[in-house]
Amino acid sequence: EKTADCFDAEMAKNADLITQVRCYADIEKNIAEGKMSAMLTVEDGVPLEGKLERLDAMYARGVRLITLTWNHENSLGFPNKTAPDKGLKPFGIEALARMNELGIIADSSHMSDAGFWDLVKYSKKPFVASHSDAKALCNIYRNLTDDMLRALASKGGVTGLNFEAAFLVEHTNYTRVEDLVRHARHIADVAGVETVALGSDFDGISATLEFKDCAGLPMLEEGLNKVFTAREVDLITHGNALRVIKDCIG
């Protein structure tokens, strides 16, 4: 609740530049007015504590995406790092159905492999891996296999490129644009360009980046332009994410 209060305060302080969105129409309104959009999200379903009424309360507060697990077990499921073979718990399946009904996007990043496949099985709406890369290019537990990428595409979802160097190239701590482009190209080749989005995770990574914050994203766009068409770059940078938001939250 304190974090949400902080979010509200930031929105109020910068209302001329950015406003909270609760539905796709809010995003369209902000675009028309030249404003940025901010969507309240939760990383880790631990605050739910097995209670659907808390999910309803989060929705009423404006939450529109929940990363189901983080780096530890919770009432929904298990993290990939320690329990890759354990899927969604019964409450996780129940909560997913309620999220689909309400219009809250389910995020599989950090979730166990088995939990990912349960999302494929049980979700009635697209879901996302908000900050995960291609395991075929960097074999780390947090990345997605080619089969996962194809399954994500079949659900109409996206994976957001994670800018953490260790997720892009093994044994490095420097994030290069060319490595991000390489992962984007692989994901597009395997699952279609409609499955690629930007995840960044600027506030959650320890790597040194070729560009340090979102002000440097034009560097990434320039790199993407070398291997994708202009239409495809538009999809990767914003179009795919907007489609999923529209499909999921209405």
Regions found by a protein language model. Give the residues of each.
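Mid-to-C-terminal alpha-helical segments outside catalytic/metal-binding sites
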Residues: 212-250
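Short acidic/histidine-rich active-site segments
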Residues: 163, 191-212
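Flexible, glycine- and charge-enriched loops at secondary-structure boundaries
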Residues: 85, 89, 173, 177, ...
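Short, solvent-exposed loop/turn segments at secondary-structure boundaries
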Residues: 139-141, 171-174, 208-212
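Extended, charged catalytic domains and RNA/DNA-binding interfaces, predominantly
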Residues: 1-162, 166-169, 181, 185-188, ...
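Conserved residues at the C-terminal ends of beta-strands
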Residues: 69, 199, 239
